[in-house]
């Protein structure tokens, strides 16, 4: 799993740093954006193995951004995991139905979070 590039699209700097530090400690390379629009450009340019997408971003929301990624030939095969602090607003079933490949609630259960990442990266490499 190590050395895979993961794009983190999260507008909260503390959350972004926490996720980045966790992933880098596990050997992943990370790329970060605090806005969906910039994240879409980075995804197209760098083709990460996985995108972690906050749902409630300022500006374009995470659901709209994910749908644009899935609609683009350049990024449609990159798995996108929804990450949200709002378990009441967005549930796993509705986020997967929207088109996300995975779903995690912040704060993360570390073992579930890493297992989901491993599953999605394996899926993207096959």
Question: Which stretches of residues belong to each language-model region?
Answer:
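Conserved acidic carboxylate
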Residues: 10
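Acidic catalytic/metal-coordinating carboxylates
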Residues: 14, 35-38, 61-67
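Charged docking surfaces used in two-component/phosphorelay signaling
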Residues: 17-25
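Short hydrophobic/Thr-rich beta-strand motif most characteristic of the beta2 strand and flanking loop
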Residues: 27-34, 42
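Short amphipathic alpha-helix used as the core "switch/output" element in two-component signaling
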Residues: 41, 63-76
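Active-site beta3 strand of CheY-like receiver
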Residues: 46-52, 57
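The short loop immediately C-terminal to the conserved phospho-acceptor aspartate in CheY-like receiver
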Residues: 56-58, 81, 86
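The feature encodes the CheY-like receiver
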Residues: 58-61, 76, 88
């Amino acid at each position: 799993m190590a050395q895979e590039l993961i794009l983190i699209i999260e507008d909260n700097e503390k959350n972004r740093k926490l996720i980045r530090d966790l992933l880098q400690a596990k050997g992943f390379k990370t790329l970060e954006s605090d806005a969906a629009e910039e994240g879409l450009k980075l995804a197209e340019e760098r083709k990460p193995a996985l995108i972690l997408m906050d749902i409630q971003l300022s500006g374009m929301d995470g659901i709209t951004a994910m749908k644009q990624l899935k609609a683009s030939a350049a990024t449609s095969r990159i798995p996108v995991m929804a990450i949200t602090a709002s378990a009441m607003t967005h549930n796993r079933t509705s986020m997967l139905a929207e088109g996300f490949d995975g779903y995690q609630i912040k704060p993360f259960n570390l073992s579930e979070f890493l297992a989901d990442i491993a599953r999605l990266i394996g899926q993207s490499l096959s």
